[in-house]
Amino acid sequence: QHPLKGMHIIVDAGNGNGGFFEKILSALGADTKGSQFLDPDGRFPNHIPNPEDREAMASVCKAVEESDADLGVIFDTDVDRSAIIGRKGEPINRNSLIALISSVILDEHPGSTIVTDSVTSDGLAEYISEKGGRHHRFRRGYKNVINEGIRLNEAGEECWLAIETSGHAALRENHFLDDGAYLAAKLIVFAAKLYKEGKQVHEVIASLKQPKESKEIRIKLTDPDFKAQGAKALEDMKAKAEGVEGWTIVEPNYEGLR
């Protein structure tokens, strides 16, 4: 059987270990012409294999657009992270990726809690709520996110998805393993169903509100007692935020200051 026959899907392995995925899609009937950087090469001569990296995403988005593909998939080095590219070359990573897989999960498991790391957007929280789920924004670090999902289930709260903005995703149905290939496969199955209906994945997250601006800044802590220095910085930021009219500190909050 060839369930993906008629679909054109590009794989970008970034010269990491994800090249095998193209062979699987091809065997299932997909047209994979335009797939790139499938052979492992630890020098990573084309771009860093990272679904968060702007250069990497720009490369695969361009490949999808130029090949007129229906979908694109990009993996990190060891295939525990992935992201999707839509029909017109639009990137579906970070908040958009979480929104898309959350939509799939909430269709299958209405009311599920979705655990994420701490840097997800307010727009994502609204999207999950509108889909009937509960957004549990936790700490950064894929182990923190996954372990929190496991803990909630053990406490009697249904959680079927734990995911970081980096693309680390763990599903309860897959024993909470952080498996980028499993995430990609689940989204491709969903995309194939939409394809038969004449729809595209980006339509599913059209209502997701995107941040006006999003930028990550990493500040070096120079004091040998870096924990104390970091804690002092958070205290100072909190004092500053409390003094600004119209600003509200989010509670509950499990990491940093929001």
Predicted feature locations:
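Short acidic, glycine/serine/threonine-rich loops at helix termini
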Residues: F20-I24, P45-I48, S82-K88, L124-E130, ...
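Short hydrophobic/aromatic-enriched beta-strand-loop microsegments
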Residues: D31-F37, P91-S96, G132-R140
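N-terminal small/polar loop signature for handling phosphorylated ligands or for N-terminal nucleophile
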Residues: S26-I85
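Gly/Ser-rich phosphate-binding catalytic loop and adjacent alpha/beta segment
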Residues: Q1-R43
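Short beta-strand segments
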Residues: D12, I74-D76, A162-I163
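Phosphate-binding and adjacent anionic-ligand microenvironments
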Residues: L71, H109-R258
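Gly/Ser/Thr-rich loops at beta-strand to alpha-helix junctions
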Residues: G14-G19, V79-D80, T120-D122, G167
